[in-house]
Protein backbone atom coordinates (compact mmCIF):
# COMPACT_ATOMS: atom_id res chain seq x y z
CA UNK A 1 0.00 0.00 0.00
CA UNK A 2 2.81 2.40 0.89
CA UNK A 3 4.62 1.60 -2.37
CA UNK A 4 1.42 2.26 -4.31
CA UNK A 5 0.98 5.61 -2.56
CA UNK A 6 4.56 6.60 -3.36
CA UNK A 7 4.05 5.74 -7.04
CA UNK A 8 0.89 7.82 -7.11
CA UNK A 9 2.84 10.81 -5.74
CA UNK A 10 5.55 10.61 -8.41
CA UNK A 11 5.16 13.20 -11.12
CA UNK A 12 5.46 12.30 -14.78
CA UNK A 13 7.72 14.14 -17.23
CA UNK A 14 7.18 13.90 -20.98
CA UNK A 15 10.37 14.13 -23.06
CA UNK A 16 9.77 15.18 -26.67
CA UNK A 17 12.74 14.65 -29.00
CA UNK A 18 13.04 16.40 -32.35
CA UNK A 19 15.79 16.13 -34.92
CA UNK A 20 18.61 13.65 -35.23
CA UNK A 21 19.75 10.52 -33.43
CA UNK A 22 22.37 12.57 -31.56
CA UNK A 23 19.52 14.49 -29.96
CA UNK A 24 17.87 11.19 -29.10
CA UNK A 25 20.98 10.08 -27.19
CA UNK A 26 20.87 13.34 -25.22
CA UNK A 27 17.22 12.71 -24.37
CA UNK A 28 17.96 9.15 -23.28
CA UNK A 29 20.67 10.40 -20.92
CA UNK A 30 18.33 13.04 -19.49
CA UNK A 31 15.59 10.44 -19.05
CA UNK A 32 17.94 8.29 -16.97
CA UNK A 33 18.76 11.26 -14.75
CA UNK A 34 15.08 12.10 -14.29
CA UNK A 35 14.21 8.52 -13.42
CA UNK A 36 16.99 8.51 -10.84
CA UNK A 37 15.48 11.73 -9.46
CA UNK A 38 12.20 9.90 -8.87
CA UNK A 39 10.08 10.88 -11.86
CA UNK A 40 8.01 8.71 -14.15
CA UNK A 41 9.24 9.49 -17.66
CA UNK A 42 7.53 9.08 -21.03
CA UNK A 43 9.00 9.70 -24.47
CA UNK A 44 7.46 11.40 -27.52
CA UNK A 45 3.91 11.63 -26.25
CA UNK A 46 1.66 13.32 -28.83
CA UNK A 47 -0.25 15.06 -26.05
CA UNK A 48 0.87 15.80 -22.49
CA UNK A 49 0.65 12.69 -20.33
CA UNK A 50 2.39 14.17 -17.30
CA UNK A 51 2.59 17.35 -15.31
CA UNK A 52 5.87 18.48 -16.90
CA UNK A 53 7.11 18.47 -20.51
CA UNK A 54 10.66 18.91 -21.82
CA UNK A 55 11.07 19.52 -25.56
CA UNK A 56 14.52 18.71 -26.96
CA UNK A 57 14.68 20.86 -30.09
CA UNK A 58 16.58 20.81 -33.37
CA UNK A 59 17.97 23.88 -35.16
CA UNK A 60 19.87 22.21 -38.00
CA UNK A 61 18.11 23.76 -41.02
CA UNK A 62 15.02 25.87 -41.67
CA UNK A 63 12.53 22.98 -41.68
CA UNK A 64 13.91 21.69 -38.38
CA UNK A 65 13.57 25.12 -36.79
CA UNK A 66 9.97 25.36 -37.96
CA UNK A 67 9.13 21.91 -36.61
CA UNK A 68 10.65 22.77 -33.23
CA UNK A 69 8.85 26.10 -32.95
CA UNK A 70 5.52 24.50 -33.90
CA UNK A 71 5.99 21.82 -31.24
CA UNK A 72 6.82 24.44 -28.59
CA UNK A 73 3.71 26.43 -29.52
CA UNK A 74 1.57 23.30 -29.41
CA UNK A 75 2.68 22.44 -25.90
CA UNK A 76 2.49 26.10 -24.84
CA UNK A 77 -1.18 25.97 -25.81
CA UNK A 78 -1.62 22.80 -23.74
CA UNK A 79 -0.14 24.65 -20.77
CA UNK A 80 -2.47 27.60 -21.27
CA UNK A 81 -5.40 25.18 -21.27
CA UNK A 82 -4.28 23.76 -17.94
CA UNK A 83 -2.97 20.43 -19.22
CA UNK A 84 0.62 21.10 -18.11
CA UNK A 85 2.15 22.49 -14.94
CA UNK A 86 5.59 23.20 -16.37
CA UNK A 87 7.08 23.45 -19.86
CA UNK A 88 10.83 23.44 -20.48
CA UNK A 89 12.72 23.65 -23.78
CA UNK A 90 16.31 22.58 -24.47
CA UNK A 91 18.46 21.50 -27.40
CA UNK A 92 19.99 23.06 -30.49
CA UNK A 93 17.29 25.62 -31.26
CA UNK A 94 17.29 27.11 -27.77
CA UNK A 95 21.10 26.94 -27.66
CA UNK A 96 21.20 29.34 -30.60
CA UNK A 97 18.08 31.47 -30.01
CA UNK A 98 17.56 31.29 -26.25
CA UNK A 99 16.95 35.00 -25.63
CA UNK A 100 14.70 35.46 -28.66
CA UNK A 101 12.58 32.41 -27.83
CA UNK A 102 12.16 33.46 -24.20
CA UNK A 103 10.73 36.78 -25.36
CA UNK A 104 8.49 35.37 -28.09
CA UNK A 105 7.08 32.36 -26.17
CA UNK A 106 6.63 33.41 -22.52
CA UNK A 107 4.50 30.33 -21.75
CA UNK A 108 7.71 28.31 -21.54
CA UNK A 109 8.94 28.27 -17.94
CA UNK A 110 12.58 28.18 -18.99
CA UNK A 111 14.77 27.67 -22.04
CA UNK A 112 18.06 25.80 -21.72
CA UNK A 113 20.98 25.34 -24.05
CA UNK A 114 21.99 22.00 -25.49
CA UNK A 115 24.22 21.02 -22.58
CA UNK A 116 22.41 22.49 -19.55
CA UNK A 117 21.02 19.27 -18.07
CA UNK A 118 22.44 19.96 -14.61
CA UNK A 119 20.67 23.30 -14.49
CA UNK A 120 17.38 21.68 -15.48
CA UNK A 121 17.69 19.12 -12.66
CA UNK A 122 18.59 21.86 -10.20
CA UNK A 123 15.55 23.92 -11.22
CA UNK A 124 13.40 20.87 -10.50
CA UNK A 125 14.97 20.67 -7.06
CA UNK A 126 16.85 17.48 -7.91
CA UNK A 127 20.50 16.45 -7.97
CA UNK A 128 22.42 15.62 -11.12
CA UNK A 129 24.29 12.33 -10.71
CA UNK A 130 27.69 12.50 -12.40
CA UNK A 131 28.20 8.77 -11.89
CA UNK A 132 25.39 8.06 -14.38
CA UNK A 133 27.23 9.74 -17.27
CA UNK A 134 27.27 6.59 -19.45
CA UNK A 135 23.78 5.37 -18.51
CA UNK A 136 20.71 5.93 -20.67
CA UNK A 137 17.06 4.94 -20.79
CA UNK A 138 16.91 3.45 -24.27
CA UNK A 139 14.02 4.39 -26.55
CA UNK A 140 15.20 2.17 -29.41
CA UNK A 141 14.28 -1.52 -29.84
CA UNK A 142 16.08 -3.49 -27.15
CA UNK A 143 18.62 -5.12 -29.49
CA UNK A 144 20.32 -1.91 -30.67
CA UNK A 145 21.41 1.53 -29.54
CA UNK A 146 23.00 4.65 -30.93
CA UNK A 147 26.58 5.35 -29.83
CA UNK A 148 27.60 9.01 -30.00
CA UNK A 149 31.38 9.32 -30.20
CA UNK A 150 31.86 13.08 -30.57
CA UNK A 151 30.19 16.49 -30.45
CA UNK A 152 30.45 19.45 -32.79
CA UNK A 153 32.06 19.89 -36.19
CA UNK A 154 35.02 21.79 -37.66
CA UNK A 155 33.52 22.09 -41.14
CA UNK A 156 31.73 25.27 -42.17
CA UNK A 157 29.10 24.13 -44.66
CA UNK A 158 26.97 27.06 -45.77
CA UNK A 159 23.64 25.27 -45.18
CA UNK A 160 24.43 23.93 -41.69
CA UNK A 161 24.29 25.70 -38.32
CA UNK A 162 25.76 22.86 -36.26
CA UNK A 163 29.25 24.42 -35.78
CA UNK A 164 27.60 27.63 -34.58
CA UNK A 165 25.39 25.72 -32.14
CA UNK A 166 27.63 22.96 -30.79
CA UNK A 167 31.09 24.39 -31.45
CA UNK A 168 34.22 22.69 -32.72
CA UNK A 169 34.63 18.94 -33.00
CA UNK A 170 35.29 17.26 -29.64
CA UNK A 171 35.99 13.53 -29.59
CA UNK A 172 35.03 11.44 -26.57
CA UNK A 173 37.94 9.51 -25.04
CA UNK A 174 38.05 5.96 -26.34
CA UNK A 175 38.05 4.54 -22.80
CA UNK A 176 34.81 6.36 -22.01
CA UNK A 177 33.14 5.09 -25.18
CA UNK A 178 34.20 1.50 -24.44
CA UNK A 179 32.81 1.83 -20.92
CA UNK A 180 29.47 2.90 -22.38
CA UNK A 181 29.53 0.03 -24.87
CA UNK A 182 30.10 -2.45 -22.05
CA UNK A 183 27.21 -0.95 -20.10
CA UNK A 184 24.86 -1.16 -23.07
CA UNK A 185 25.92 -4.73 -23.86
CA UNK A 186 25.08 -5.63 -20.25
CA UNK A 187 21.58 -4.32 -20.95
CA UNK A 188 21.16 -6.65 -23.92
CA UNK A 189 22.25 -4.42 -26.80
CA UNK A 190 23.70 -6.42 -29.71
CA UNK A 191 24.01 -3.79 -32.42
CA UNK A 192 25.48 -0.29 -32.28
CA UNK A 193 24.88 2.53 -34.73
CA UNK A 194 27.89 4.81 -34.35
CA UNK A 195 26.95 8.46 -34.80
CA UNK A 196 28.61 11.88 -34.84
CA UNK A 197 28.39 15.02 -36.90
CA UNK A 198 31.65 14.04 -38.63
CA UNK A 199 32.41 10.37 -37.98
CA UNK A 200 35.67 10.17 -39.92
CA UNK A 201 37.17 13.03 -37.89
CA UNK A 202 36.96 11.04 -34.67
CA UNK A 203 40.23 11.13 -32.75
CA UNK A 204 41.99 13.91 -34.66
CA UNK A 205 41.67 16.34 -31.75
CA UNK A 206 42.54 13.82 -29.01
CA UNK A 207 44.98 11.47 -30.70
CA UNK A 208 46.23 13.62 -33.61
CA UNK A 209 44.94 11.13 -36.18
CA UNK A 210 41.70 9.58 -37.38
CA UNK A 211 40.83 6.80 -34.94
CA UNK A 212 37.45 5.43 -36.03
CA UNK A 213 38.88 2.13 -37.38
CA UNK A 214 40.88 1.65 -34.18
CA UNK A 215 37.82 2.38 -32.04
CA UNK A 216 35.82 -0.28 -33.84
CA UNK A 217 38.69 -2.78 -33.72
CA UNK A 218 39.28 -2.27 -30.00
CA UNK A 219 35.57 -2.68 -29.33
CA UNK A 220 35.56 -6.09 -30.98
CA UNK A 221 38.86 -7.10 -29.37
CA UNK A 222 37.87 -6.27 -25.82
CA UNK A 223 34.16 -7.01 -25.82
CA UNK A 224 32.25 -10.25 -26.06
CA UNK A 225 28.95 -9.35 -27.66
CA UNK A 226 25.95 -11.55 -26.82
CA UNK A 227 24.82 -13.97 -29.54
Task: List the predicted regions and their residue ranges.
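Proteins enriched for Cys/Gly/acidic motifs involved in redox and nucleic-acid/cofactor modification
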Residues: 8-202, 211, 217
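Active-site core of PLP-dependent enzymes with the aminotransferase class I/II
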Residues: 205
Amino acid sequence: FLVWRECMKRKTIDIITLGCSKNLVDSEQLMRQLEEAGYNVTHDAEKPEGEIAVINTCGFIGDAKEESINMILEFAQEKEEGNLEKLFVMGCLSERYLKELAIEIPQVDKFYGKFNWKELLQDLGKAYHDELYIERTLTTPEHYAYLKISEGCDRKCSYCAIPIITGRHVSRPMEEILEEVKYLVSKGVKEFQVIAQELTYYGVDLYKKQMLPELIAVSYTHLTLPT
